[in-house]
Amino acid sequence: MASGLPHPVLLSDLVGLGHINVGGQSVEFKHVFYTWCVMAMLFAVSFIVRGKIKMVPGKLQNIFEVIIGGLEEFVVSITGEDGRKVYPVLIVFFLFILCMNLTGLVPGFDAPTANINTTASLALFCFIYYNYIGIQRWGAGYIKHFMGPMWWLSPLMLPLELISHTARPLSLSLRLFGNIRGEEFVLILFFMLAPIIGTIPIYFLFTLAKVLQAFIFFMLATIYLKGSLEHAH
């Protein structure tokens, strides 16, 4: 927490998992703890919902089908029909990041995505996954397209392409981390300046912002996968 800001009472500290000792050194562990909480919640909800899916959907099931189906059509509109094969990974990205973002609005919790290690891990997985899909689909042709359309351009194109692709996980991780961490600080400042009731409108604004950040990550991952699924020019 920044100097001068009050330290909130966190669940991770109450259960003794805010920090752990590794080799005699105190290491911050709270964001791993909250990530586990989100994973446990998602697994529990998935298990419960799975048993309640009906052929004739109710209102809640209809809402989820519209959201999930709408996001799938969004992916297909960008990547083509091949996007349906990678959609399960993309929707897990969206839901996982969304839940981690929203965790920061729950009293006693901190958003795991407010830690650079969490966002860097997500971005690195995305980077490895879309390159794996490209190599799996096109083989050596995927690597070849980094060198440009003509062989004599390869000394120029190869470094540029490598820098461009390497910058992707960096930008993904820093964008998500910076926005979520900044919102956490702003929320603390509002709590200092206004009563709890006065901060309720800010909660709605931050909820929208956290949904938007999850969607931006989802959209960029979709665009990167589009490049992997397309034929290397």
UniProtKB/Swiss-Prot annotation:
Keywords: ATP synthesis, Cell inner membrane, Cell membrane, CF(0), Hydrogen ion transport, Ion transport, Membrane, Transmembrane, Transmembrane helix, Transport. It holds the Pfam family ATP-synt_A. It is a multi-pass membrane protein. The gene is atpB. This is ATP synthase subunit a. Key component of the proton channel; it plays a direct role in the translocation of protons across the membrane. One of its GO terms (biological process) is proton motive force-driven plasma membrane ATP synthesis. PROSITE patterns: ATPASE_A. The lineage of its organism: Bacteria, Pseudomonadati, Thermodesulfobacteriota, Desulfovibrionia, Desulfovibrionales. Belongs to the ATPase A chain family.
